[in-house]
Amino acid sequence: MEKFTAKLRDIQETKFPIVKAAFKGKDEQIYIGVMMIDTGSVNCILNKSVLPNLNDDAAIEGKTMKIHSVQGRGVECQGYSLSFRIGNGVFSDTFYVNKEMDFDQMFDGPFIGIIGHEFLRRNNMVLDYETETLHASEGSIKGNPEDYAFFFTMSYGLKQYNIPVVGLVYGDKEYLMVADSGANDTVITKHLMDDAGICVRHLDNEGTVTCFTTDTLETALYDVTLSIISVGGTPECPKLYTQNDKVQVISNCQYIMDGLKDAEGNDLMPISGMLSSNFMHKNKWVLDFGTGVMFQRKDE
């Protein structure tokens, strides 16, 4: 059986991991467009402009969900059943619709929707910035963590936050960021930048971040140093993967997400930022949802 694979469109041009997609709608007509792979989204999201093309029975009765965005803001979304093709595979899943937001203005060409990480996990897929493909996982990782420039497991983030996260370490201070392919620019809070002392230089004062709830947050642009923890060190001497990045800095909140608790009701560390698709593409990261590992290979 042929293994699943789908080519990503030119990420330098699109800014996001985008795949060509198609679905059969009313009157047996085939509709062609694109979908975005969003590792910062749990669920699949359908663009509201697609709704008139769906079968009348596509809405799932009683299937609604409040989907949250930055700072805990949420919006109630209706679930729809969608069968679709990407690459050489055909899939079916529940997609949720935010009827207050139209994604067409954000993307070039007919935009069908967003593929969340639960879909990637169920179907054992890999978002591969090195080969610029979405493909089936091999089910195992070659070599040891020390053989990679960066290596980190998704298990903690997925278990506690239901999103893949990475840890930042600066001396005795630790922070968390979402590995978010749905963010074209890395976003952090000013609290993180100032508290960790990671500013290299200020670049610009005028920027914005648009959230899933349609809220727009004003930002400033900075060059910062990100020291991301990687498997292979010790508690006393962690292995750090250090890269500079141009980031959007939010000043009106201390954290991106806070007030979170685990299954036992214990407080969880707040989330201080979102690591972008641009960063992961630039550094050729591989996010393997079949094995639950994120990594970057060492240069040959």
Residues covered by each model-derived region:
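Pepsin/retropepsin-fold aspartyl endopeptidases
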Residues: 1-300
